[in-house]
Curated annotation (Swiss-Prot):
<dbReference type="InterPro" id="IPR008455">
    <property type="entry name" value="HssA/B-related"/>
</dbReference>
<comment type="similarity">
    <text>Belongs to the hssA/B family.</text>
</comment>
<feature type="region of interest" description="Disordered">
    <location>
        <begin position="1"/>
        <end position="24"/>
    </location>
</feature>
<dbReference type="Pfam" id="PF05710">
    <property type="entry name" value="Coiled"/>
</dbReference>
<protein>
    <recommendedName>
        <fullName>HssA/B-like protein 8</fullName>
    </recommendedName>
</protein>
<dbReference type="GO" id="GO:0030587">
    <property type="term" value="P:sorocarp development"/>
</dbReference>
<feature type="compositionally biased region" description="Polar residues">
    <location>
        <begin position="1"/>
        <end position="22"/>
    </location>
</feature>
<dbReference type="InterPro" id="IPR050533">
    <property type="entry name" value="HssA/B-like_chaperone"/>
</dbReference>
Length: 87
């Protein structure tokens, strides 16, 4: 599943999406995509990173109960998908 179809297939009335696709020196930028995923209980917080094809790292989600926020910026040679929920 592509990142775009993954985002558009999430049916959540709380989601807000801002996307822009541009070729900036061989990079595909999805801009700022955030999804409010609802409560997961607890009061925890965490974040995750991905390694980009150019060697940089991108924080792709942060979680502070009760909301997950996902942010995507992928190069052409990378792929990924998103999902809402408690991981």
């Amino acid at each position: 599943m592509s990142i775009l179809s993954a985002l558009t297939s999430i049916s959540n009335p709380m989601k807000s999406t801002k996307s822009s696709v541009a070729n900036g020196g061989g990079r595909l930028s999805m801009g700022s995509n955030s999804v409010a995923c609802g409560s997961c209980g607890g009061g925890n917080s965490s974040s995750g990173t991905i390694n980009n094809a150019d060697g940089s790292q991108t924080t792709y989600y942060s979680y502070t109960s009760p909301v997950y926020t996902y942010n995507y910026s992928y190069s052409y040679s990378s792929s990924g998908s998103s999902s809402c929920g408690c991981h």
